Structures are given as C-alpha cells and as structure tokens.
From Swiss-Prot:
Structural component of the virion. It comes from the Viruses. This is 23 kDa structural polyprotein.
C-alpha cells in the first residue's frame, strides 16, 4: 500500500 487510503490501496 502506497498511501493506505480507500482510493489508493494498491492501484498506485
């Protein structure tokens, strides 16, 4: 996880 947000879990 780059940020750990609900929008950027593992998509980044």
């Amino acid at each position: 996880m780059e940020f750990g947000n609900l929008t950027n879990l593992d998509v980044a």
